[in-house]
Amino acid sequence: MLPRRLLAAWLAGTRGGGLLALLANQCRFVTGLRVRRAQQIAQLYGRLYSESSRRVLLGRLWRRLHGRPGHASALMAALAGVFVWDEERIQEEELQRSINEMKRLEEMSNMFQSSGVQHHPPEPKAQTEGNEDSEGKEQRWEMVMDKKHFKLWRRPITGTHLYQYRVFGTYTDVTPRQFFNVQLDTEYRKKWDALVIKLEVIERDVVSGSEVLHWVTHFPYPMYSRDYVYVRRYSVDQENNMMVLVSRAVEHPSVPESPEFVRVRSYESQMVIRPHKSFDENGFDYLLTYSDNPQTVFPRYCVSWMVSSGMPDFLEKLHMATLKAKNMEIKVKDYISAKPLEMSSEAKATSQSSERKNEGSCGPARIEYA
C-alpha cells in the first residue's frame, strides 16, 4: 500500500486538476512523438522516391486509409506534400449537372416561346445543393440586370451574407471555339486581363484532365489583392453540341497561403456554352453560375455591387479579347483539338473502366481536358 502522506498528496493533486494536467502532458508527448515520426518518414521517402513515385504511393495509401476516423489520408498527404487527386478531381457528375441546368433553362425558354410569349430566358430554377432555406425550400432567384443579350440573377447562399450569381448571355460575332479557347488559355489571359498578377498551372491530372491553377488578381482599392487556388476541368460534347467548364477552390501543398494576398477559399464557377449552329460558326448562348467569398469586411450590399458589376465587365473583356484574337489572328491554344475527336463505343467502355487505372481517355465525340 502507498504511504498515507503520498496517497493524501496524490488525492490533493487530483482535486486541484493535477491528474488532468498529467494526462494532458502525456497526450502532448505522444502526439508530438507521432508527428515527428511521420515527418521523418516523409523526409525518408522524399529522398528515396521521385515526386511521381511519391504521388502513386500516397494515392495507394489514401485508398487504404479512406473512410477511417480522423482523415489520416489527408494528414499523410499534407506531410508528404502531395496533392490527392482522388479527393479533389472534378468528377463527370459535376460536368453533367451543369449541362442539365442549361438544358432545363432551354426547355423552359422553349415553353414560353411556343406559348406565344416573347423569347427570353425565364427565371432559372437551379438544383444546386446548399441553397435551401430552413424549411428545405430552394432560394428564389432575383433579377439584377435585364438586357437584350445579358441577363443576371442572384440568390442568397443559406447561412452566409453572400449571393450566388447566374448569367445567361449571347454573342453573335465570335465562334464558340474561339470564346472557349480564349477563356482557357492562361498565357493569353495574362495579356488581355490587366488585373492578373499571377496565373499558372500547378499540377495536371492524367486521369480526368483536371488541373490545379494558382491565380492572383488585383481587387479594387483599398482592398488587398486576392489569390485563388482552384481545380478546373472541361468537356466538349460533340453529340449534344455543348461545352462545359467547371472550377472550384481547393488546397494544394505547393501553394501555401501568402501574407501578401488574401486567400479565397470558397469559390465555384460553372460555364456551359451552346452553339447556335456549330463550334466553328459565329453565335452561341452561355450560362454562367458563380459564387465566391472574397473575405472582405465590407457590407453585403458593397460586395454584391462589386460582383454584379464586375461580372459583366469581365465577360465583356473576355468577349473583346476573343474578337481581338480573331481579327488579329493571335495564336491561341486550341483546347478542343487537344485530344482525338472520335472513339468507338468499345473504346468508350474501356475508357470508363480505366479511369481508376490512371489511363486518361475520352468517350465518343467528347473531348476532355483542363
Curated annotation (Swiss-Prot):
GO CC aspect terms: extracellular region; mitochondrial outer membrane; mitochondrion
InterPro entries: START-like_dom_sf (IPR023393), START_lipid-bd_dom (IPR002913), START_lipid_transfer (IPR051213), START_STARD7 (IPR041949)
GO biological processes: establishment of skin barrier; inflammatory response; mucociliary clearance; myeloid dendritic cell activation; type 2 immune response; ubiquinone biosynthetic process
Chain segments annotated as coiled-coil in the UniProt record: 86-111
Chief localisation class: mitochondrion
Subcellular location: Mitochondrion
Transit peptide, from-to: 1-58
General function of this protein: May play a protective role in mucosal tissues by preventing exaggerated allergic responses.
Record-linked PANTHER family: PHOSPHATIDYLCHOLINE TRANSFER PROTEIN, STAR-RELATED LIPID TRANSFER PROTEIN 7, MITOCHONDRIAL
UniProt name for this protein: StAR-related lipid transfer protein 7, mitochondrial
Gene giving rise to this polypeptide: STARD7
